[in-house]
Structures are given as C-alpha cells and as structure tokens.
Amino acid sequence: MAPKVFYISDGTAITAEVFGHAVLSQFPLEFESLTIPFVETLAKAENVKRQINDCFITTGERPLVFHSIVKPEIRDIIYSSEGLDYDFLNTFVAPLEQHLGVSASPVLHRTHGKANHGYEARIDAINFAMDNDDGQTMKHMDQADLILLGVSRCGKTPSSLYLSMQFGIKAANYPFTEDDMDNLKLPEALKRNKKKLFGLTIDPVRLHEIRQSRMENSRYSSLKQCRLEVKEVEMMFKRERIPYIDTTNHSVEEIATKILDVTGLERHMF
C-alpha cells in the first residue's frame, strides 16, 4: 500500500507541495497524496484533523503531513492529529529569529497574495505567454524577455508558461514546422530580437513517441519526419549561433532552470 501524504496550508499549499515533493523524491516509492489549501478556520482545521485520523485508522500507518501554516491556533490542531508532522515554517522561522534578532510577524498570504509586487508581473507574463504561444502573432516579440524556438512538441509551450507563472518572465515561443524544412530560416521579427532567442531540441525517438500519442501513424509523427526536423533545426541553431538545450527526459522545472542559467535572465518574482 502506498504511503499516504497530506499537503496542508492556510494559503495555496504551493510551498508545502514544493518542499514535500522535493523531500519525497529522494525515496524510490509511490505516494498517495492529498492537497488541502486554505485551511483558514478552526472548523476547517478540525475537519482536516479528522481526515488525517481516519486515514490512520483505515491504514494502520501514520500519514505524512507536510504543512506551511501561519496561524498558530490552526497549526496546533494539525499537530494534535495522528499524522507525522513536517512543519516547514516553524523549522526555519525559529532559527532565523535567533540569527536575525527579530521576531517573525506572520501575515497570511503575504507571499502569494495580491499585495505582493510580483503578482502583477506574474499575471502580465502569463497573459503574454498565452497571447504569443506557438507563433500566433509576431507583433509583440519586441516586448518579450525570451523567445523559445524549436520543433512542434519539444516543450516550448509548457516551458513558456512555467517561466511566466513562476518567475514573471514574458516568454514567447515560435515553432518550426514541416513546411519550413525546405528553406529553414529565421523570420524577420525573430532576427530583430536575436539576443532573446533560445532553442529547445529533443531526441527524435522521444519526439516520435510524443507525436504518436497525438496523431498516430501520420507523416507528422513518423520517426523519419521527426529525425529530419530535429536535424534541420539543430543545424540552424548552430548556424545562427542560437543557444539551445536538449529537453529529452527533463521536467519543465529542470528545463526552465537551465534556460535561466544559460541566459542569465533575472527573475521578476521572489
């Protein structure tokens, strides 16, 4: 039976999930997880406690409980459950208070709330990424922080959206298609913004597998076509001196981090 995991917060639970996933990824096990955000009242906390206790009674194993709860009274209720508690905020806050000589003054949603100056940057960047996805328009390339290039289904769209959501980076993306292969070159709008260009490539066999799941037994998904497109686009990257990385078997988080590392782009959030 897969170990049970709870991610709990009086906010979005993003912090609890990120830290929890980072810790649990060190173990070669499959986990069954439940995320419970916005536990902002005593009644909600008591309900979560019942869920944790019911899980313990049903399985006979104490579930893992990762939480980032600001309010002490909410946190105390979770502490009193039958779960194994991993409290990220308290783990780091107490030592920091001692080191900084300042008492923490917790404010709910300070990190992810609208009052945060990064909120508007996030929304603007997300809208930009969606409006400039997959070469829909070339009118706004001058406003982009980054323009991702590559063949269809190599990871451009998820990478653009992740960069916008996590870091407030305005990322456009442009695909090179089968029709481009006979005379592959950069459109004028991309040439004008060459310093913003960054390429993504992928192993042709993996690309074939991805495309097969979308358009099985088509020319678009054939291994021959995948090999041709990847080869031609990589040659163009080298010819135009466009930096690029291989996305094969990498998560979108890893791809985004590599892009930031290579380009030196500054995060607009955090």
Curated annotation (Swiss-Prot):
Keywords: Kinase, Nucleotide-binding, Serine/threonine-protein kinase, Transferase
Signal peptide: none
Enzyme superclass (EC): transferase
This enzyme's EC code(s): 2.7.11.33, 2.7.4.28
Binding site for ADP: 150-157
Reaction equations catalysed: [pyruvate, water dikinase] + ADP = [pyruvate, water dikinase]-phosphate + AMP + H(+); [pyruvate, water dikinase]-phosphate + phosphate + H(+) = [pyruvate, water dikinase] + diphosphate
Disulfide bridge map: none
Superkingdom per UniProt: Bacteria
InterPro entries: Kinase-pyrophosphorylase (IPR005177), PSRP (IPR026530)
Keyword Membrane among record annotations: no
GO MF annotations in UniProt: ADP binding; ATP binding; phosphotransferase activity, phosphate group as acceptor; protein serine/threonine kinase activity
Sequence similarity: Belongs to the pyruvate, phosphate/water dikinase regulatory protein family. PSRP subfamily.
Function: Bifunctional serine/threonine kinase and phosphorylase involved in the regulation of the phosphoenolpyruvate synthase (PEPS) by catalyzing its phosphorylation/dephosphorylation.
PANTHER family: PYRUVATE, PHOSPHATE DIKINASE REGULATORY PROTEIN 1, CHLOROPLASTIC (PTHR31756:SF3)
Protein name (database record): Putative phosphoenolpyruvate synthase regulatory protein
Species whose genome carries this gene: Shewanella sp. (strain ANA-3)
